[in-house]
Amino acid sequence: CSGQSNMEMPMGGFDRQPVRGTNDIIAKAKPSTPIRMYTTDSKDGRWVRQFSKTPVEDCQGEWLENTPVNVSHISAVSYYFARYIQEVLEVPVGIVVSTWGGSKIEAWMSRESIKPFSSIDLSILDNDAEVKNPTATPCVLYNGKIAPLTNFAVRGFLWYQGESNRDNADLYQSLMPAFVADLRAKWGRGELPFYFVQIAPFDYEGADGTSAARLREVQLQNMKDIPNSGMVTTMDVGHPVFIHPVDRKSVV
């Protein structure tokens, strides 16, 4: 489960940004329910962001039981999805959450997948320059937060991202299929399901802005172009004033 802040938003909500209807679900969480949760960058209550110019083999994190405290801090979209799958299939479910608010898709792509795009400058990966903006630097989030996970067996991917790529929707139309193809290749298990969320109906640029609408069109086309993929629209569950919709359940 990856993406930017709309994937990261926990069941307990952000500061002054609650999630609707989660209090009862959090309170009723119990370890006997076979849902387990792992969030990269989070361990022992500490939050340390990890990124790298080169792929790393390990990342900080720990598997957590299904308890009220743990559930309150896990990604809401991820948890609702895991809860649904567990109830319907009656099997143990594990979710791995790797997110960073405000991140561009380029940061989540491997060097191999992004190299064909000549307009993207990869020179910082080969020099001594400091990475000052990891969320917009190609490959560094893949290297630090996805590469260490590729030895895990997974059954599919959830993706909630795109707001930070509104400035170049045409490029995004090519980047996203390359990103998905590379993820599937890295895990080597065929066309694993890839489900993603269309960006929220936030008033990004005012009434005359069109970049968000164009990005949504691109996401719709990507769903058609990427095999074994699906897209959830959020146009009817969001709000133009809040970039993080309070209704997380409807997304799933």
Q: Regions from the language model: what does each represent?
A:
Residues C1-S250:
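Cell-envelope and extracellular/periplasmic
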